[in-house]
Amino acid sequence: MLTKKQDLRVTVHKNEKGCKLVSGTRLYYEIKGEGQPLVFIHDFSLDHRMWDDQFYYFSRWYRCVRLDLRGFGQSALPGQENYTYHDDLKALLISLDITQPVILVGHSLGGLIAVNFALKFPRFTQAIVLCSTQIEGYVFKDFKLDALFNKAKRKGIEYAKRKWFAHNVFAPARKNKPVSEALWQMIHFYSGWHLVDKHASLSEDLSAWENLENLTAPTLVLYGNLDLADFREISEAAAFRIRGAKKVILPDTGHVVNMENPSAFNKELQNFLAALPVD
């Protein structure tokens, strides 16, 4: 029988949210559920809320963790210090007493972070799920954000955020009113810091694009057939070059796969998780 103290600990463990001071910054996080840690990493300009349909669903079987990256959502803005998102994530997990290998689910920028994390901390990574992913070192052919950064510097962050929301990368998502509204709420809330300042992912070069073959964690690569060509190319290359990777293409789905098609996304993620080896 559990003691009263243990009961309290388990209750907190099941549902917790707040901020942690780690790596010289303040990071917002939420935890729900028990079991193997399942960590959700959001995309550029978005925040932890993009994972609503996954966070609550998978918390029935996993200890789900989601966060706002430095400069996004409810986390603190960056200063002048050097930092990386993957180091921030590792520090946050340690501060939450999560010391066993984790399953990382990252969307776009979040996928880039998941790859970097897995390369730098392989013993701390059980598996990675790359959704419409970016990978550091890939040179985009069509998806270029220089114009967006220039608009932010010339016409202001709010103007640049409106232009970003109107970008073709969100075209399929904008056709779905609830998804479109949820995306705009996050983009509107976004600080815009990275539009006018140094981007953290450039502060450490892990040569991820050249080192995909060195990834050892089980990997799911998932993208929508309506995504932009660059992201489809990245996903195809990742699925081909990462040893044993599984590839899933969701039909009639664009860049924001988990929000545009949550039922199919959750099914594919659940199938992948169920097939992972049990420690």
Regions of interest found by a model, annotated:
Residues 139-141, 154-213:
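Conserved alpha/beta-hydrolase catalytic His-Asp/Glu region
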Residues 106-110, 114:
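Gly/Ala-rich beta-loop-alpha elbow adjacent to hydrolase catalytic centers
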Residues 43-53, 64:
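Serine-hydrolase catalytic-loop signature spanning alpha/beta hydrolases and amidase-signature enzymes
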Residues 35, 43-46, 108:
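Active-site glycine-rich loops that stabilize anionic/oxyanionic intermediates
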Residues 115-120, 125-156:
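Flexible "cap/lid" loop of the alpha/beta hydrolase fold
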Residues 32, 53-56, 65-105, 267:
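Active-site loop/oxyanion-hole signature of alpha/beta-hydrolase fold enzymes
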Residues 245-279:
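Catalytic active-site module of serine/aspartate enzymes centered on a nucleophile-bearing elbow/loop
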Residues 195-240:
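Conserved serine/cysteine hydrolase catalytic core
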